Amino acid sequence: MKVAIVFLSLLVLAFASESIEENREEFPVEESARCADINGACKSDCDCCGDSVTCDCYWSDSCKCRESNFKIGMAIRKKFC
């Protein structure tokens, strides 16, 4: 019985690590060239890379990509870009 539990645990661990590896988000070269990193120049939220990064024009004349305080709302908004 203990052997079966250990075997099933290893099996679940193997599948979990494989699914995590498949879900890693890597930007293709073309997509990373189209979007700006943190502190990069932007005109709208869609210009910034990542689901939780927003275009911030509040503090200065030049807009820059910044980490958003509302990560869930920003992730939903980025789906429509």
Curated annotation (Swiss-Prot):
Its main location: secreted. Disulfide bonds join C35-C49, C42-C55, C46-C81, C48-C65, C57-C63. Expressed by the venom gland. InterPro entries: CNTX. Transmembrane segments: none annotated. One of its GO terms (molecular function) is toxin activity. Residues 1-16 form the signal peptide. GO terms for cellular component: extracellular region; host cell postsynaptic membrane. It is found in: Secreted. Pfam families: D_CNTX. Residues 17-34 form a propeptide. Keywords: Disulfide bond, Ion channel impairing toxin, Ionotropic glutamate receptor inhibitor, Knottin, Neurotoxin, Postsynaptic neurotoxin, Secreted, Signal, Toxin, Voltage-gated sodium channel impairing toxin. Protects against glutamate-induced neuronal cell death in corticostriatal neurons from both wild-type mice and the Huntingtons disease mice model (BACHD). In addition, it also protects neurons from Abeta peptides, which are the main components of Alzheimer's disease amyloid plaques and are very toxic to neurons. The presence of a 'disulfide through disulfide knot' structurally defines this protein as a knottin. Belongs to the neurotoxin 03 (Tx2) family. 05 subfamily. This insecticidal neurotoxin targets two types of channels/receptors. It reversibly inhibits the N-methyl-D-aspartate (NMDA)-subtype of ionotropic glutamate receptor (GRIN). It inhibits glutamate uptake from rat brain synaptosomes, and blocks GRIN in hippocampal slices. It also acts on sodium channels of both insects and mammals. This is GAMMA-ctenitoxin-Pn1a.
